[in-house]
Amino acid sequence: MIKDMIDSIEQFAQTQADFPVYDCLGERRTYGQLKRDSDSIAAFIDSLALLAKSPVLVFGAQTYDMLATFVALTKSGHAYIPVDVHSAPERILAIIEIAKPSLIIAIEEFPLTIEGISLVSLSEIESAKLAEMPYERTHSVKGDDNYYIIFTSGTTGQPKGVQISHDNLLSFTNWMIEDAAFDVPKQPQMLAQPPYSFDLSVMYWAPTLALGGTLFALPKELVADFKQLFTTIAQLPVGIWTSTPSFADMAMLSDDFCQARMPALTHFYFDGEELTVSTARKLFERFPSAKIINAYGPTEATVALSAIEITREMVDNYTRLPIGYPKPDSPTYIIDEDGKELASGEQGEIIVTGPAVSKGYLNNPEKTAEAFFTFKGQPAYHTGDIGSLTEDNILLYGGRLDFQIKYAGYRIELEDVSQQLNQSPMVASAVAVPRYNKEHKVQNLLAYIVVKDGVKERFDRELELTKAIKASVKDHMMSYMMPSKFLYRDSLPLTPNGKIDIKTLINEVNNR
């Protein structure tokens, strides 16, 4: 168990100063360097005389200087707001307007001119590092102080800043490094793929820094080159893979992504979206000896609230994989529309309680009051997810409350339709989306389909292919759930966080 994230890093700077904490295609930085650099940057930040505990926006990619700046800000008592280099200018502006940061640190060239807020460039960070200033930690982030603030996409399009405290982070990190499901080894060798602006990144950097491991990052230029990306990943000595399931699906398009080519890769950690039976089955075929851990949880409950190791028996017997045993310190409940706790096996909304629950959305009391509350004397959060608990306290996922539609008199869960279509042996990936009429009632249901290699060539017309796919799933799919139109694509759009971008597809079919 760790009691302070920075204390842990400082300890490794003493005991394994020359061990790499960061590796980008062979460009390495050690724990000793991280301490020296973060001390110097923290001293520089203190010299700016910012308002105590005010948040600082940090703009960039998955570079070492981003990591060193995060550590420096924690030392100097400031929460950091990570904003990815690929973020749209409109989103960056919205984050600034909501967060009102006292400073912007631009590790990459900043795309906006902001009046009234000082901007520190990479050259100034480099100069601060060269100064090698000593630093005494007298006002570091601790307890209920905000450690980081991650902005999620709000349903209205307005981002919401989730405040995660040092205590929240410790609750998550200690569970992850001690829980048998994750089985995190000492000095873990972690692939650092999800951007820092996505809280799934915490699942790789927190246990790595807590256990003295190495983060294997990828330059932003490489991430944009699909073929080269997965050729390079196959050459990295990573032992643990952390990503969304969608990113693993992309990786499996490369023949190099297999146990024979990547023998060091023994653990897969998934979170951020649903892990399908199809993806898990394919992974077991590619990596027969690997452990697949399925985690679940919203950003508002600090990355994940449950986890479970997926077995081959689960893949054979479940249509939707279980999402885990809840964290011991985070009692998780299923409630009905009236807020009443439901019994085992009954489906309702998943709510999470305990020390990992955020204090709320930054500068947004209205949205905070809607989502955060007290349940059984503990801080609690409405996940907006449908689920149930088995008698063995295993959490089962039933979809999103806001992805439920009413169609032809039936209440339909879009993710359930997608799951059923993904069961077809011809389908590589499928997403169901509604088309609305002028009264915003569902007019019909459509499906975006990516078929497996070689499938299209077996059919003369798409109509015949559609009939074949429908026939392959009709025995386990209710007729009213079957989409009326299938749209075939070579790939489906992904969000910057690597999830299938369902909202973009919904907007596309509705000409928004």
UniProtKB/Swiss-Prot annotation:
- Record-linked InterPro entries: AA_adenyl_dom, AMP-bd_C, AMP-bd_C_sf, AMP-binding_CS, AMP-dep_synth/lig_dom, ANL_N_sf, DltA, DltA-like
**Any idea which positions bind D-alanine?**
D199, V303, K499
For the ligand (ATP), the binding residues are T152, S153, N294, A295, Y296, G297, P298, T299, D385, Y397, G398, G399, R400, K499
Q: List the pathway annotation.
A: Cell wall biogenesis; lipoteichoic acid biosynthesis
* UniProt cross-references to PROSITE patterns, sorted A to Z: AMP_BINDING (PS00455)
Q: GO cellular component terms?
A: cytoplasm
What's its catalytic activity?
holo-[D-alanyl-carrier protein] + D-alanine + ATP = D-alanyl-[D-alanyl-carrier protein] + AMP + diphosphate
| Keywords linked to the UniProt accession | ATP-binding, Cytoplasm, Ligase, Nucleotide-binding
Primary role: Catalyzes the first step in the D-alanylation of lipoteichoic acid (LTA), the activation of D-alanine and its transfer onto the D-alanyl carrier protein (Dcp) DltC. In an ATP-dependent two-step reaction, forms a high energy D-alanyl-AMP intermediate, followed by transfer of the D-alanyl residue as a thiol ester to the phosphopantheinyl prosthetic group of the Dcp. D-alanylation of LTA plays an important role in modulating the properties of the cell wall in Gram-positive bacteria, influencing the net charge of the cell wall.
| Entry protein name | D-alanine--D-alanyl carrier protein ligase
Organism phylogeny: Bacteria, Bacillati, Bacillota, Bacilli, Lactobacillales
